[in-house]
Amino acid sequence: MPQGVDDACSLPVLTYMHGTIFQRTSAPSFLSSEGQFGFLMSSPGFIVLMPDYVGLGTSELMHPYVHAQSEAESGIYLIQAAEALGEELGYSFNGEFFSTGYSQGGHASMALSRELETNYSDVYPLTASAPLSGPYDISGTQFIQIFENTSYSNPAYLAYNIIGWNSYYGNLYEDLSEVFQEPYATGLPGMFNGEMSAMEINDYLPFLLEDLIQPGLVEEITGDPDHPFNIAAQNNDVYEWVPQTPLKMYYCTQDEQVFYQNALVAEAWMNENGAENVSSSNGGPLDHGDCAGPAILGGMLWMQDFAVECETSFVGQNARKPWTIAPNPSVNGTTVIAGLPTSVTWEIVDITGRTIHSGSGLQVDFSSNAEGIYFIKTDNWGVKRVLVHP
């Protein structure tokens, strides 16, 4: 929940879908590292919801990795639960609903957005969504590129996918030795106990896919469109629908885990089939880990432009006076405050809430700040966001 919000404020709801985790205690409900994003995302005035997925958090089920239906349902159920608790906890929804998430969370965000528009538009109308670096086209882009190469950066993901889907569908294999060679067929099930990390599982698995997957299996799958694996993959593609609300995907071109063409395929299909406000943003030649920060922040900033703001109680009586900062993004390390007295005092705060420096007057100097997102916080006039570019 955002802090200092006036009791009379109804607030927009942002559902953040988390990325791939193997350890149950890494789920948002345990306030894991990714769970901390909720504090940041709520600061502009959002009620932030961060669902655990089936098999994670306190659940002891096997997690059906990148399973669209259960991902979407986890988001819907948490929205419903938050709505039911609103009166007791003293908050209310303003009728705006947003969705975002990175990596697996990008897939889950797309699945949730589709579900909201398809089946809940009269109850929880989606305002905008920002899926980030997600495998939207599992059956095509993602698996084809994995199997066209001799190795994959995270073979644990592939094992997670197969074992997780089989826990739900039950028809991908009868015995894991049909899919994986020994000793992995015997050793892998025990590693997906909700306690092992991605690093531990990846270190256990071989570098080359030919040493992991049974010979001939890839050819068997690719040669049979009705193979259970292909059917499961197609059921969990999440891009073949036409969004009626703004949707923006973010990706990076050196992503070695979730191939960036997922976003391009999704964008092309949606626009060719009548979508009017679907786009994507290229974050440049970053790998999956380095892409996360810019993508998440970019998605947040983009969605904020669609949110109805509510005045908060901590900004002072003069907060309603209109003021702006320009240019924004800053140019050559400076920006200017317009619409406030020349004696105004301010602080520069980073996205963690840390005060970087303070000053007074209408010119704000960012020349010593690293590239990123900052906030100009005034004593009596409120807060404004500013982007700093080199």
Annotate each PLM feature.
Residues 248-255:
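Short beta-strand/loop motif that positions the catalytic acidic residue
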Residues 306-332, 339, 354-356:
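Residue-level detector of functionally pivotal "anchor" positions at catalytic/ligand-binding pockets or at interdomain
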Residues 81-152:
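Primarily recognizes the serine-hydrolase "nucleophile elbow" in alpha/beta-hydrolase
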Residues 132-240:
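Accessory cap/linker subdomain of secreted extracellular hydrolases
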Residues 5-40:
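Short, surface-exposed "cap/lid" segments of acyl-processing enzymes
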Residues 371-390:
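C-terminal tail/sorting-segment detector
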Residues 65-87:
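Alpha/beta-hydrolase active-site loop
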Residues 143, 230-231, 257, 264-265, ...:
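C-terminal catalytic histidine-bearing segment of alpha/beta-hydrolase fold enzymes
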